[in-house]
Amino acid sequence: MANKLFLVSATLAFFFLLTNASIYRTIVEVDEDDATNPAGPFRIPKCRKEFQQAQHLKACQQWLHKQAMQSGSGPSWTLDGEFDFEDDMENPQGPQQRPPLLQQCCNELHQEEPLCVCPTLKGASKAVKQQVRQQQGQQGQQLQQVISRIYQTATHLPKVCNIPQVSVCPFQKTMPGPSY
C-alpha cells in the first residue's frame, strides 16, 4: 500500500513539474540595429522587393504618421490606445466606416504575401519614425510617446485590416529606453 501511495505521489509530482516547466517559457527577440544589419527589417529578400514595389506602403505610412501625431485618446474607433476589434468581428464584411486612408493602407497590406506583412510594416514604421524625428525635432518623453504610438498602431494593423494568417506583428520599437 505504501509503495502504491509513493508511486502515485511521485507520478503526480512529476506531472506537476512537467506542467510547471512548460508554463514558463522565455521568448527572446533579437532586434538588430539596422546600421549593423544590411538586411534591415527584411530578413527575407522577397519582402524587401515587395516593400519597394509597393512604394514603401505609402498609405500605411501616412496612416501611421496621422495616428502617432494625434494626442489624447485617439480616434473614435480606438479605446484607451488599443484598437476596438468588436466591429470587425461582428460584421463579416469588415468595418462599415473605415477612414479612407486606413482603407487604402489595408488594400496595400492585402497585396502583400502573408509572410511579408510584418517585415513591410516594420519598414514602414521605421520610415515614419525617421520622418517624425526629422520633422518634429522632438526629444525625450514626447518623442518616445509618438514612436510608441507608431509601433502600437502598426502592431495591430493586420488584425484591423483582416489580413489572412496574420493577426498582430510582434515587433517592438527600436530605440534606447524602456521597452513597453
Swiss-Prot record:
The GO terms this record gives for MF are: nutrient reservoir activity
Question: Does the record bear Metal-binding in its keywords?
Answer: no
Lineage of the species this protein comes from: Eukaryota, Viridiplantae, Streptophyta, Embryophyta, Tracheophyta
Q: Where expressed (tissues)?
A: Cotyledons and the axis.
Q: Which domain of life is it from?
A: Eukaryota
CDD domains according to UniProt: AAI_SS
Q: Which UniProt keywords apply?
A: Disulfide bond, Seed storage protein, Signal, Storage protein
Q: What is this protein called?
A: Napin
Signal sequence annotation: 1-21
Q: Coiled-coil intervals in this record? A: none
The answer, when asked if Signal is one of the entry's keywords, is: yes
Q: Which SUPFAM superfamilies does this UniProt record tie to the protein?
A: Bifunctional inhibitor/lipid-transfer protein/seed storage 2S albumin (SSF47699)
Per the UniProt record, the source organism is: Brassica napus (Rape)
What Pfam families does this protein's entry cite?
Answer: Tryp_alpha_amyl
Q: What does this protein do?
A: The small, basic, water-soluble napins are one of the two major kinds of storage proteins synthesized in the seed during its maturation.
Q: How does it assemble?
A: The mature protein consists of a small and a large chain linked by disulfide bonds.
Q: Which InterPro entries match?
A: Bifun_inhib/LTP/seed_sf, Bifunc_inhib/LTP/seed_store, Napin/2SS/CON
| Family assignment from sequence similarity | Belongs to the 2S seed storage albumins family.
Prosegment residue ranges: 22-38, 75-94
